[in-house]
Curated annotation (Swiss-Prot):
The protein's enzyme class: transferase
Membrane topology: Multi-pass membrane protein
Enzyme Commission no: 2.1.1.17
InterPro entries attached to this UniProt entry: Phopholipid_MeTrfase (IPR007318), Phosphatid-EA_MeTrfase_fun (IPR016219)
Bias type Polar residues, positions: 1-15, 703-713
One Pfam family named in its UniProt record: PEMT
Protein name (Swiss-Prot/TrEMBL): Phosphatidylethanolamine N-methyltransferase
Intervals, Lumenal compartment: 1-89, 135-199, 249-281, 326-399, 443-473, 520-564
A GO cellular component entry from the record: endoplasmic reticulum membrane
Phylogenetic classification of the source organism: Eukaryota, Fungi, Dikarya, Ascomycota, Pezizomycotina
Biological process according to GO: methylation; phosphatidylcholine biosynthetic process
Length: 978
C-alpha cells in the first residue's frame, strides 16, 4: 500500500512523502476543463459551512472536480459485524477461510512447503501484479482506459454498455460500501475505477498477510534446550515488534487516509492541504521500512530461519516495488519542475567580446569572454563518488584503485597468523585515527583561518584548485580507512564449521543487515548533501547561510553518528573478535568526537540560530516520553555537553604543540612525495488482409530540413572523379534529410473501413528485412491512428487528427474516398542517433505492414569553421551559438519550459533531473564539433552561451590535434625548428 504521507511544503520527494496540495493537483491533460471548476463547486457547497469543511474535493486529470466520499478501512469493512457485507467481502472472507482450512487439513510434512508457495504467490501478486497495474496506470492510464473502452460504468439505458449485469453488480457493490455522498452514475470514471481496484487490492493484501502468518505457524517451534528466560525474552521482543508494527500501520493510515493507502493519486488528485506528522516524522518510507518490523517479530516468535529468510525476501520485494513503481510516479506527479523565469535580453548588447586578434595564449584569448559562473559554490561536473564516476585518467582514482589492489593483494597472500592480524588491526586503527583526527584538524584549521586554501593561494593557485585537491585527499583517506578495516576484518574472520551451531547463522544475517543499513545510510546522505556537502564544501566556500533539511536529515540531525557506523558493528557481529570490537569502539568514539569538535562548531558559526535542535525522530520520541524520562534525557545531555567542553579545553591547551608537530610532519612528507535492449521478435499474421487494397494506404512525411551545407556533406575528395559531384534531385527523387531531434509530421491515408487499431511505428531501415511483416519491437516509437483504441494514452501522444475523409485519385485515374490523419513524432518517440529510418503503417494492432514511407536520413551537420574568420574570436563564438541553439532546442523537445529561446536563457530545471536531455546534447556536440563532453558539462553550463564558450575553448586547446582543416598555423616544419 502507498505509505507516503502528505507534506505541507517540505521536500516532498527526498523522504518519500507526497506533497499533495491545490497547486499539485492541476489538470495534467492539455485540454481545457470541461466540468465545473473547483470554485463553482465550493460556491454550491458554501450553504452548509460545517458540512463543507468535512468534504474533500478530487480532481481528475482532465480537470473534472468532484466530491470524494468518505470510505472505511479494509479491516473494518471485512471483519466488523456492523459494516454491511456484499459479494466481494464474502468472497475475500471465503478465500481467507480456505487458507486457514488448508493449514488444518494438510499433513505436517507438506504444510511448510505449501504455505511457502502460497505466500510467495500472493507476495508476487502484490509486488509484481499490483506493481504492473500501477505502473501501466501511471504511464498510460491503462486501468481507466480499460474502463472507458468497456463502458462498464455507463448506464445500460443509454445503449452503450454491453454488460448490463456487470453494471448492476458493480453499482450495488460500491453503493452498498459507500452510502454517503456517493452516486455510482455521477462519479467520474477515474474514481469508480479506483474503487474497483481497491477491491482487488483488499483481496491480495489480506491473503498476503494471512498466508504469511499461517506459514509462520507451520514453521513455528521451540529450539531444543532453550531456557525459559530465552523463551520469554524471544516472545516479549517479538510481540513488541508486532505491536510497534501495528502502531505504525494505524498511525500511517490516520495520516494518509484511504486515498494514499490505496494509491489514489495514480487515478486522481485531491484539493486539500494534508498534514505531516506521526510515524512519518520518524523514518523515511515508514510503511516500507519500520512498517515491516512485525515480520521480524513473528520470525522471532516462530524461532525459524525459514520465516526469517522469507521475511527478508518479502521486505526486499517491497523495497523494489517502492523504487520501481512508487518513486517514479511521485517524481512525475509531485516533483514537477517550477516554471522557468524568463529573462529579457537586449539582443543588441548580448555579445560584447573582445574582438582583438588572439596572439597570446588560450587563456588570454578567452579571459574577457568567459562565462560568468557562480563563485559561491563550485559547479560539480566530474564527481568522485560512485562506480560510474571512476575515471582512470584522474590521478585520484588511479591512486585509490592502486591502493585497493595493494590491500587486496596483501590481504589474500599473507597468512592469518597473530603477527599479521596485529599488523592489519594496527593499520586499520592508524587509518581511522588519521581519518578522524588528521582530517578533523585540517577542517578545523580551514574553518578558523582557511589554512588549506591559504597554502594553495601562496603558490598562485585558486580556491577551486584547493577544493579539488582537498576532495582527492579526503576521498583517498576515506577509501583507505574502510579498505584497511575490511582487510582487518577479513584477517580476523574464520569460516564457521557448523552454520547451525548456536547463533552463528543469526549473527551473519544481522551483520549483513547492518552492513546494508550503513550502505543505504551513506547513499541517502550523499543524495541529500551532494558532492559539495559530502566533502564539507561549506568549509571552503562562503555561501549565503541557507540550511535545509531534506532526505534522511528530516529524521536525524547526524545520521552518521549511529546509522553511519552500523556496518562496522555488523562486521563485529560476523567476526566476533575482540580486535574488531576495539576497532568499532575506536571508530565510533572518534566519529562522535569529530562531529562534536569539528562539525558542530563550524555549523554553529556558519548557520547560528537556524540550526535545528531536534530532528523528526527525536521530536516524536520526546512527545511519547513521560516527564520523568524527559528529565533524565536533559541530565544526560548536560553531562555530555560538559564532557565535550572539557575535551575542547584540553585540545585548545595542547594545540600549539600539536600544530608544531603537524606542520613539521607536513613539511617532511611534502618533501618526499556504458545496451542493447533485448529485441522481441513478434510476427502476427492477420487472416482478413484480403479485404484491403494496399494502394489505399500511404505515408508522407514533413520535417525540418537541415542547413544547405549538410545536404552536400556526402560529396568529398575520397570518391572517384565522376562521383565527387552530387546529382541534382527534386520531387520524389530528392533525398529526405531531417534535423536531429526535430519533430516529424506523418500524414497517412487508409481505406474508410480500416481497423481502428492501426498504428504507425518508426524503425531503422536495416532493422527489418521483410517489407510485409515487421519483425522487431518499436520500443515505444509508435502512435495509434485512432483515439481510445489501445489500453494506454501514451500511444495517443502526438496524434493530431484521424479518419478525415479525403478524395484522392489513384494511379489508374480512379477517384476514391479514403480516411486520412496526421500525427507528430517527437521527443521519446524519435531515434536520438544518426541513420536512415522509415515509418511503417501496421494493421489491426498486429505487425502486418500495409504501407512504408520513403526512407529518410537523420543527420547532424558538422560546423563549418571556414565560414567565419578563425582569428576573430567574437565572430567564431557567435557562429557557434547560432549553430548550437536550434540543436539544443531540438534536444529539449522544443518544450518552452526547458528549451532556451536565446543563447543567454538558462535551461529548465528538468534538464538537471533527467539525464537524457544532456546526453542528447553531448551526442550532437560531438558530431558537430568533434569534441566529446560529459553530460554533466551541459548541466553545469546551464545555457547555450556558456556551452559555446566551452566549445570554443576546447577547440583552441585541441587545435594541434584537430583532424579537420584549420585556418591556424600548421605544425612547425624542420625549417622552422632550425
Amino acid at each position: 500500500m502507498s505509505e507516503q504521507a502528505n507534506s505541507s511544503g517540505i521536500e516532498s520527494l527526498s523522504n518519500g512523502l507526497r506533497e499533495r496540495n491545490a497547486q499539485a493537483s492541476k489538470p495534467i491533460g492539455d485540454g481545457e476543463v470541461t466540468s465545473q471548476s473547483l470554485e463553482d463547486k465550493l460556491q454550491v457547497e458554501e450553504g452548509d459551512a460545517a458540512d463543507a469543511e468535512k468534504k474533500t474535493f478530487g480532481r481528475t486529470p482532465d480537470g473534472k472536480v468532484f466530491t470524494v466520499p468518505p470510505t472505511r478501512d479494509m479491516v473494518s469493512q471485512l471483519l466488523s459485524p456492523s459494516e454491511p457485507k456484499n459479494i466481494s467481502d464474502i468472497f475475500v472472507l471465503a478465500i481467507l477461510g480456505c487458507h486457514i482450512l488448508l493449514l488444518w487439513c494438510l499433513p505436517s510434512s507438506f504444510r511448510i512447503a505449501a504455505f511457502a508457495v502460497i505466500f510467495l504467490f500472493w507476495r508476487a501478486s502484490y509486488n509484481i501484479g499490483i506493481g504492473w497495474l500501477l505502473h501501466m496506470q501511471s504511464n498510460g492510464r491503462t486501468l481507466v482506459c480499460w474502463a472507458k473502452k468497456s463502458n462498464i460504468f455507463v448506464n445500460p439505458s443509454t445503449g452503450q454498455n454491453p454488460h448490463p449485469t456487470l453494471y448492476k453488480m458493480l453499482k450495488w457493490e460500491l453503493e452498498t460500501k459507500i452510502s454517503e455522498q456517493y452516486s455510482f452514475d455521477e462519479a467520474p470514471t477515474e474514481y469508480n475505477t479506483w474503487l474497483v481496484f481497491r477491491r482487488v487490492v483488499d483481496l491480495i493484501l489480506m491473503c498476503d498477510f494471512t498466508s504469511y502468518c499461517l506459514f509462520a505457524i507451520a514453521c513455528g517451534g521451540r529450539p531444543a534446550g532453550e531456557s525459559f528466560i530465552m523463551l520469554a525474552l524471544r516472545w516479549t521482543t517479538g510481540m513488541s515488534l508486532v505491536l510497534f508494527n501495528l502502531w505504525v500501520k494505524l498511525d500511517a493510515h490516520r495520516v494518509v487516509k484511504d486515498f494514499a493507502w490505496y494509491w489514489g493519486d495514480f487515478f486522481y488528485l485531491i484539493d486539500q492541504e494534508l498534514t505531516f506528522d506521526g510515524v512519518f516524522e520518524m523514518a523515511p518510507h515508514p510503511m516500507y521500512s519500520v512498517g515491516y518490523a512485525g515480520y521480524y517479530g513473528i520470525s522471532l516468535m516462530a524461532a525459524s530461519y525459514k520465516v526469517l529468510f522469507i521475511s527478508i525476501l518479502a521486505h526486499a520485494a517491497q523495497f523494489a516495488f517502492l523504487v520501481l513503481v512508487e518513486n517514479p510516479h511521485i517524481e512525475k506527479t509531485y516533483n514537477v519542475p517550477p516554471p522557468r523565469k524568463r529573462v529579457a535580453v537586449d539582443t543588441d548588447t548580448k555579445l560584447q567580446e573582445d574582438e582583438n586578434s588572439h596572439e597570446g595564449s588560450v587563456v588570454s584569448d578567452i579571459a574577457n569572454s568567459a562565462p560568468v559562473m557562480p563563485a559561491l559554490q563550485p559547479v560539480s561536473m566530474h564527481n568522485l563518488l560512485g562506480l560510474h564516476n571512476i575515471d582512470l585518467y584522474r590521478s585520484t582514482d588511479q591512486s585509490v584503485l592502486l591502493a585497493q589492489l595493494l590491500f587486496f593483494a596483501l590481504t589474500t597472500v599473507t597468512p592469518s597468523t597473530p603477527v599479521y592480524q596485529f599488523c592489519f588491526v594496527l593499520n586499520a586503527a592508524l587509518w581511522r585515527i588519521w581519518y578522524s583526527v588528521g582530517i578533523g584538524y585540517i577542517l578545523n584549521r580551514q574553518s578558523n583561518c582557511k589554512m588549506w586554501t591559504r597554502h594553495f593561494v601562496k603558490y598562485g593557485e585558486s580556491n577551486h584548485e584547493a577544493w579539488r585537491q582537498w576532495k582527492g585527499t579526503y576521498h583517498l583517506s576515506m577509501t583507505m580507512t574502510y579498505a584497511s578495516f575490511i582487510a582487518a576484518a577479513w584477517k580476523m574472520y574464520s569460516f564457521p564449521q557448523d552454520w547451525g551451531y548456536g547463533l552463528v547463522l543469526l549473527r551473519h544475517i544481522l551483520g549483513a543487515s547492518l552492513i546494508a543499513l550503513q550502505i543505504w545510510t551513506s547513499t541517502s546522505i550523499y543524495e541529500s548533501l551532494g558532492e559539495f556537502g559530502w566533502f564539507f564544501g561549506d568549509f571552503f566556500f562562503d555561501q549565503s547561510p541557507k540550511l535545509t533539511y531534506s532526505g534522511i536529515y528530516r529524521f536525524l540531525n547526524n545520521p552518521e553518528r549511529v546509522l553511519g557506523l552500523a556496518g562496522v558493528w555488523g562486521a563485529v557481529l560476523i567476526t566476533s573478535t575482540k580486535s574488531l570490537v576495539f576497532l568499532a569502539l575506536l571508530s565510533h568514539t572518534l566519529t562522535l568526537a569529530f562531529i562534536q569538535l569539528v562539525e558542530r562548531p563550524h555549523m554553529q558559526k556558519l548557520y547560528g540560530q537556524s540550526l535545528r535542535r531536534d530532528a523528526g525522530l527525536v521530536r516524536s520520541l520526546k512527545r511519547s516520553l513521560p516527564p520523568s524520562l524527559k528529565q533524565i534525557h536533559g541530565s544526560v545531555d548536560k553531562i555530555l555537553d560538559e564532557s565535550f567542553e572539557f575535551i575542547e579545553e584540553f585540545i585548545e591547551a595542547a594545540r600549539p604543540k600539536l600544530a608544531t608537530g603537524v606542520q613539521t610532519f607536513v613539511k617532511d612528507t611534502s618533501a618526499l612525495f556504458q545496451k542493447y535492449p533485448a529485441r522481441v521478435t513478434i510476427s502476427r499474421l492477420e487472416p482478413d488482409l484480403a479485404g484491403y487494397d494496399l494502394k489505399d494506404y500511404s505515408i508522407t512525411l514533413e520535417g525540418t530540413q537541415p542547413s544547405q551545407p549538410t545536404q552536400f556533406e556526402r560529396a568529398s575528395d575520397k570518391e572517384g572523379e565522376r562521383a565527387r559531384s552530387m546529382q541534382f534531385r527534386r520531387g520524389e527523387q530528392e533525398n529526405l534529410i531531417f534535423e536531429y531531434g526535430a519533430p516529424i509530421k506523418v500524414k497517412w491515408t487508409a481505406p474508410l473501413n480500416h481497423s481502428k487499431k492501426d498504428w504507425i511505428g518508426l524503425y531503422m531501415v536495416t532493422d527489418n528485412t521483410s517489407r510485409e511483416v515487421t519483425s522487431v519491437a518499436s520500443q515505444g516509437r509508435w502512435i495509434a491512428t485512432n483515439q481510445a483504441s489501445f489500453d494506454s494514452e501514451t500511444c495517443e501522444q502526438g496524434l493530431i487528427s484521424s479518419d478525415i475523409v479525403l478524395k484522392i485519385t489513384r494511379e489508374d485515374c480512379e477517384p476514391i474516398d479514403v480516411a486520412s490523419g496526421e500525427m507528430v513524432f517527437s521527443g521519446d518517440k524519435l531515434w536520438w542517433t544518426q541513420g536512415v529510418f522509415e515509418f511503417r503503417y501496421h494493421h489491426n494492432g498486429k505487425h502486418n505492414v500495409m504501407a512504408v514511407s520513403r526512407p529518410f536520413e537523420i543527420r547532424i551537420g558538422r560546423f563549418d569553421e571556414d565560414i567565419v574568420e578563425a582569428d576573430n574570436y567574437g565572430l567564431v563564438r557567435a557562429a557557434v551559438e547560432a549553430a548550437l541553439l536550434p540543436v539544443v532546442q531540438n534536444c529539449f523537445d522544443r518544450d518552452p519550459e526547458i528549451a532556451p529561446q536565446t543563447a543567454e536563457e538558462h535551461y529548465g530545471c528538468l534538464v538537471e533531473r533527467d539525464g537524457k536531455y544532456s546526453k542528447r546534447v553531448v551526442f550532437a556536440v560531438q558530431h558537430m564539433f568533434g569534441i566529446e563532453f560529459a553530460p554533466e558539462v551541459v548541466r553545469a553550463d546551464g545555457n547555450v552561451r556558456n556551452l559555446a564558450w566551452r566549445i570554443c575553448n576546447a577547440k583552441k586547446v585541441l587545435a594541434p590535434y584537430s583532424m579537420s582543416r584549420s585556418n591556424g598555423a600548421s605544425t612547425p616544419t624542420t625549417e622552422h625548428e632550425d
